[in-house]
Amino acid sequence: MPSLVNKFNVEDLSIINGVLETANSIFKRFRFVYKSDELYAQLKYCLEEFQKPMLELFQMLTGMVDKCVNDKAALTQLFNGLRIMSRVFYSLNWQTIPEFFEDNIKQWMAQFQKFLTYTNPLLVDADEEDEAGPIETLQAAIIDNLALYADKYEEEFQPFLPEMTQNIWSILTATGQQAKYDTLSATGMKFLTSIVSKKWHEAMFQQDGILKNICEEIVIPNLTLRESDTDLFEDDPVEYIRRDIEGSDSDTRRRAAVDLVKGMCINFQGGVTDIMKEYIGQMLQQYEADPAANWLAKDASITLVLALAVQGSTKAHGATSTSDLVDVMDFLGTQIIPELGNAGPDDMPLLKATSVKFLSTFRQMLEPAHIQELMPGLVKLLEAESYVLHTYVASCVERLLILREKDDQTQLKCGPDFLSSNGLVEPLLTGLFAILGRPDYPENEYVMRAIMRVTNVAGPHIAPLCEVLLGQCTRILEKVCANPSNPSFNHYLFETIAALVKNIITADPSTASKFEEMLFPPFQSVLQMDVGEFTPYVFQIMAMLLELRPAGTGASDGYKAMFPILLTAGLWEQRGNVPPLARLVHAFLQASGDAVEGADLENLLGVFQKLNASKLNEEHGFDLLCAIFANLTVEKFSPYLGTIFELNMMRISGGKTLKYLKGFITSLSVLIGSHGADVASTAMETVQPGVFMMILDQLWTTHSSEIAQIASESVRKNLGVGTIRLFVDMAPQLLAGDQAQQALFGKIVEASVLFLEGSSVEDTGAADVVAGEEALAVAEAAGTYSAAYSKLHYAGQPPRDYFAGVADAKAQLAQSLSEVSGTTPVGAVLQGTLSEASMGKLGEYIAAAGVQIQ
């Protein structure tokens, strides 16, 4: 740091500016981070070395500006240095106001004041439209500093606030509409927003005419779209959308003007609303007088209503709270709905796009009758040539289809019957796929998401279009395989296929084979081409197809031929493949476990060994183990049991975790529940004599309560049923043994109670409609799709119930215990072992089952 400061003494401005750039890049680290002792120590060092020399340098360069008033080249370098120092000022003051800066605040504010009012025609390029000049960039940096002080250091800044506010106001009213002034204008409006929104400064804006002047001189001019904005709408629609509805417009004039309106409404809502309603009325009158010439006025009026009415919003739900002073539904009925149906889809597309945005923003206020009225017009607008317009329409339709009834969040406002009775399914899908068929921008993620939503919401009503829709999707899949460049688009594509599979096969399981015929060729292409982004999706849908096949039909020949390939080590090396691949193998074992033997079984156990060695993937290893135990005969897997248990015990002895114990005890429960305790105990005794009893005493029963708290309902059932079979099979040995063995019997019974009671952890694979839609909406809003692995919400994995024949596990526990007690009384053992709570629950089971315990 001292070496940097020493270079301030050179006369070469380019060297000084280079040093300042270096310092700026170093000091940026102090912005937007949480304070810590280490951070403050670093900041203290930087301040001690830099703060005084920087003030002196700023003052020196300011003096040089006055001397070089006619030297453009020198002025340009000087202003660049002053701008960089202003950014450094921001960094050094972001965490807290340093003592030196507080002591010298008058000197700093004097310098800033000078440049807020500085003019020099030499630094103004009248022919430049887009790139900001030296004065504008410096002023924007200074205003950022003033906004920081106004926001965080109000008391220290208060003496300078009125004059600074007046200067910034003057800049905003004098600045032209050219793009080169955009950053300066937006920054100035942000400053005003931070001031007007605070109660502390309320008196400044209570003078007659102040609010009206802000609205008239600052808000309205900056809210109205310019030629450059309409050019962007036509020439770079993707960027227009990114700014307008994806939240990247934080530095635009319109966004800053909207935020200024919202800021004024915090303390002056009534007055600002009344003022703005006047302007809205004037703008609408201008439009009605000559729509073709004044459509921008109506566009601005819609944006003003949005600014006034929306008080809270989220990307996933639109407006969540609105102003009582703005009649949104009246404006919707008188201005928005007529506009959407006015003339053809290509007439004034930007105004229509803004109208669709309004509709989408306030979608939570709409009832099914409103949507029924709107849908035909929206379907027509899908034909629009404008990329922005048909994209906004697709997004709006998609959002309307996930609206839920306020009184019953499980019910969609526009569900399957709504789409079917209004004849909307085919027109919507036809219009949406037509957009994707256009040569420009073929991978429109908003359109693909709308297709996904229509497909899912339509439910069984999608059946007549099934083959056509699936054909469209597979053709798109073939195209994107060549260059998977848009993760969101690709995710929605596979979600669409998953929704189609789910809806059709759930209604008619016999259609599973037809889906396999249509999907296997493109899926095989994905696997052969090794499209890493898509293989996890393919495996999920293939697993889903198997899981939805009619019971007892087994896997098709295509799956059987593919099964050995699924066990190839290379596939399991890719992290994103592991969860869906494990699910697919599990589904195959469930459907056709009898077909697995020999080399395939050995390779499968090799996969288990690999997964078991990984903390990240161990749960998938146990899934495979459970599938083997539940679906293969003992004769097939018993030769390998000793090795399997040895691997388990090595992991446990190396440092057991509750998660690993849950998987281990669950797999043992499935083994014992399916084949009996003797199979497990015999194999374990070959590993180490006495280890089975040790596991029962020190792992199974000791940790049963903890395991129950982290297990889902289906897993707890598997644990409970397996543990019931365990105490039944072990009863003769344990009840005939010593006091410790009898107590172990009681602890096993208590473990079964704890498993069946447990806590209500949700099944991760449960196909819950509301949860699935909400999770998908959150993922979309956050943009959290991963190229490595993204779970398909519409391909939800069903809960794993290895004991489907046991309808009531609690009744089974009571009946099993009654049978055991018929041979050997257990009442005294249970009374002496079980906790009061467990005895109470057990009593409830016994009473409900109508049995007796001796």
Show where each model-derived region lies.
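Karyopherin-beta/Importin-beta family HEAT-repeat alpha-solenoid scaffold
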Residues: 1-854
